[in-house]
C-alpha cells in the first residue's frame, strides 16, 4: 500500500510520530481475520502503540478489490474496539465500476469513516479530496491541511476540475474504459504462450509474469511499465522471469 511503501515517512511525520504496521494478505488485500490476529499482538500495554485506525486501499496496489462484504467484515471487527476505518481510494472509481455497486455501498454503508478520494489516477491534474463520513474525524482537519502545505494559492483552479470530473458520471466512464482495457490485455496475455497473470484482474492493473528477454525487448521497443514483485509470489517466479505492472487508462 502507498501509505506503507511509497510515501517516504510522511504519514508518520504529519501524525507527529504515529506507527504504521503493515499487514500482508493474498492479492494485496487484508481480511478481518488478519486484522484480528494483529490486534491480538498488542498485549504489552503502554509499551505497545495504541491502535487507532485501519487503512485499506481500494482498488489495491495489485489491482484487486475489496467488496462491500469484505469491508463490512473489517468494520464489524474494529468498531467495537474504537478504531476508525480509512479507505485509500486513489483508484476508487475502478473498484466501484468493477464491482458494479454504488459509492455509498462501498463506503459509509460498509463502515468506512473517511476516504481519500482519488482523481489524479483517473484523469485529473493535482486533484484529490478527503471525504469524511464521520464528521468527528474531521476535527482540526482544516488546520492540518494548512500545516501540510496543501492550502496553495489559486487552488480553486485545480479544484474546479472536481465539478467536471463528477458531472454526468465522467469519473465512472473513465474507470470503465480503463478496466475494460485491462481485461482485454489480460485475456491477450492469457492466450499467449509467453506470459501469465500473477493476480486477479479486477480493476485497471495487470500484473504479468514474463521471460526477462521478452521484458527487455518490450522496453527496447519503447513500451513503458515497471517491474514489481510481491512476497507472495516468491517461489513462483523462475530465475529467468520477471513480474511487471501494466496500468491501463
Task: Tell me what each language-model feature is.
Residues 7-16:
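Active-site-proximal loop->helix
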Residues 16-61, 66-73:
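PLP-dependent aminotransferase-class I/II
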Residues 50-60, 65, 98, 102-203:
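Active-site C-terminal subdomain of aminotransferase-like
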Residues 66-97:
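Catalytic PLP-binding core of fold-type I/II PLP enzymes
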Residues 1-5:
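Conserved PLP-anchoring active-site segment centered on the Schiff-base-forming lysine
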Residues 53, 84-86, 114, 243-245:
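Structural preference for beta-strand elements that scaffold enzyme active sites
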Residues 183, 188-249:
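Conserved C-terminal alpha-helix-loop-beta "cap" of PLP-dependent enzymes
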